[in-house]
Amino acid sequence: MTRVTMDQDTENKVLVIKNMDSGYLVAGEQVTLEDVSYDATEPLAEDELMVQLLYATYDLFKRDLASSSADATELRGRKPVETMSIAQVIKSNNKQFQEGDMVIGRLPVQQYVLIKADDATELKLLENPCEFDDIRLFLSVLGVPGLLAFSSLYEIGRPKKGETILIAGASDEIGQLVGQMARLEGLKVFGSVESDEKLDFLITELGFDGGFNYAKESPYEALPRLVPNGIDIYYDNLSWMSRLNIGGLDTHFDLLGSRHLNAAFSSMRRYGRIMFYGTIAEQTVLDPIIGMFLHNTVLKRLTIRGFGLSDPSFGKKWGKLHMERMQQWVKEEKLKIPTFEITGMDNAAKAFVEAFYSSENTHTHTILAVT
């Protein structure tokens, strides 16, 4: 490790949200960098440590923002952006962490972060038994996104060889991972995306059997064409986006989620499984639709279940197997993890906006390399 020499003049910038409810996000306006004043030479209190941020990802921050909880409301106020990050300990007065240790956890997007004693318990040492050179994997397939995709597919989807899965909103990191895992289990995999470029990427690079561009083709037309014999698993990865309420995305994804769900119901086979991340949009279950919704559920003996990573039967239950199997698949190069990296703290706001508006970018896992 290169030792960082810090003094009172050491630059320390933090990414701050000013206002996320005033139209499309623009780097430098709603999301900006601010200077953080601190004395880096001051001794650390007991159990405190100082870390230098290396990598941050905004993808899961979007899902936090889409939550209907009070915490998500607080995220919209003027405050530092906090997200899953990898950092290196550069100074420690905590017995659990030594100088040079790599740690992972939810941190502010800030060059240098003083971790108070109470917050230190939320950090974890970055364990890398397979000695992967690319530690960014622990923010994607080997981290929370991978665990979310893995636990939901196996806990609810219960994939069986020969079945068919449809992933609505398959172009983001979760959708890509679910599709690749389903393919490894011998399923026929179809996905919906927002551009021809992303559809081509899913098919040619990730091995999807097919899909459709929902900007050009309605799911009511696409599903009979793609899956005339029906689908066994429907993975709703669109409806949660209706909670974003950013730059018109709420209305856009609300309508898309409704149309996908209604079309999927008509194509579900008996004993099919339907899963939703977080919360579905209100318009998805309006009164005119709910009768059909319930009728098909009973008629086709469907299982419908929402999920969140904190549920006991998800992250906690599947954590060990997720890490074992995912590491093996990564070592065997059976999974592709497309990553779009933006380098430098000065580009932190740009990377944040890119995570929300990435229609031109097929590599939808956006990573900020701080140093």
Swiss-Prot record:
GO molecular function: oxidoreductase activity, acting on the CH-CH group of donors, NAD or NADP as acceptor
Keywords noted in UniProt: NADP, Oxidoreductase
Enzyme class, spelled out: oxidoreductase
A Pfam short name: ADH_zinc_N
Residues the record lists as binding NADP(+): 172-175, 198, 214, 237, 277-283, 307-309
Chain's role: NADP-dependent oxidoreductase; part of the lna gene cluster that mediates the biosynthesis of diastereomeric piperazines. Lna and lnb clusters encode sets of enzymes that produce overlapping sets of previously undescribed metabolites such as piperazinomycin-like metabolites or morpholine. The lna and lnb biosynthetic pathways appear to be part of a signaling network that controls the formation of sclerotia, a resilient overwintering structure. One primary function of the non-canonical nonribosomal peptide synthetases lnaA and lnbA consists in the reduction of L-tyrosine.
EC code: 1.-.-.-
InterPro entries cross-referenced by the UniProt entry: ADH-like_C, ADH_N_2, GroES-like_sf, MDR_fam, NAD(P)-bd_dom_sf
Keyword NADP listed: yes
Pathways per UniProt: Secondary metabolite biosynthesis
Recorded family membership: Belongs to the NADP-dependent oxidoreductase L4BD family.
Protein name in the entry: NADP-dependent oxidoreductase lnaE
Organism: Aspergillus flavus (strain ATCC 200026 / FGSC A1120 / IAM 13836 / NRRL 3357 / JCM 12722 / SRRC 167)
